[in-house]
Amino acid sequence: MTAPPRIAFLASPAEPAVAARARLVQRFGDHALDCADIVCALGGDGFMLQTLHRHGASNKPVFGMKLGSVGFLMNQYRDDEDDLLERLQRAEPAYLRPLEMQVQTESGASAGSLAYNEVSLLRQTRQAAHLSIDLNGQTRIAELIGDGVMVATPAGSTAYNYSAHGPILPLGSHTLALTPIAPYRPRRWRGAILKADTAVRFRVLDPYKRPVSVTADSHEIRDVVEVTIRESTQRQVTLLFDPEHNLEERIFSEQFAV
């Protein structure tokens, strides 16, 4: 007989998530992350992203249950907790590779971060951002004027990217979305779909008069002068989903939401 998986239950600070964790720990035990087989994250998408950033290097599959305001990356939480082991056994994996971001700031400092949804550059003041865009070392947009620009993964393409009129990308398509944010010039440019291995470089053309910040998921860095982005070849995380509502189907269905 196969032993049940050891589950590490993580919860957001929200009261419903904390209460659910207490019940689940009482039912299934409390296993430390380093000796667990599966991570169960209780909260919303923000907490899921936090979990991936903090524990993605552990290579433990993550099964999320929605106990927050937004739950695109989560499964539904069910009051019948006894069916959790069956759900985990039937769950389908979705493999995500984050974006790797490297930043140079106006002060000369360097920084880096990962993003599972998107990396977005935004103007810091009332002045529009002036940016250049290089792809694989070739300048494609010499000067983009607008509120900013972003690079989104397929998993993140239904979030901020879609709100900025970017394309929804199928999971497993090995593509990225390059999407301008409120572009003024060139006005007709609406972005591009890139191969996942494309090296993207943004340069801020007037960082003193028109300062720009960059955010990788929730990690913000201000006063940047250059940002390089590419998909990670080293890091991959596994999310688990109920087969009747897997991530691939959710992304596909978003294209027909009205």
Curated annotation (Swiss-Prot):
InterPro entries: ATP-NAD_kinase_N, ATP-NAD_kinase_PpnK-typ_C, NAD/diacylglycerol_kinase_sf, NADK. It comes from Xanthomonas oryzae pv. oryzae (strain MAFF 311018). GO terms for cellular component: cytoplasm. Involved in the regulation of the intracellular balance of NAD and NADP, and is a key enzyme in the biosynthesis of NADP. Catalyzes specifically the phosphorylation on 2'-hydroxyl of the adenosine moiety of NAD to yield NADP. GO terms for molecular function: ATP binding; metal ion binding; NAD binding; NAD+ kinase activity. Its main location: cytoplasm. Keywords: ATP-binding, Cytoplasm, Kinase, NAD, NADP, Nucleotide-binding, Transferase. The lineage of its organism: Bacteria, Pseudomonadati, Pseudomonadota, Gammaproteobacteria, Lysobacterales. Its cofactor is a divalent metal cation. The active site is at 45 (proton acceptor). Transmembrane segments: none annotated. This is NAD kinase. The keyword Lipid metabolism does not apply.
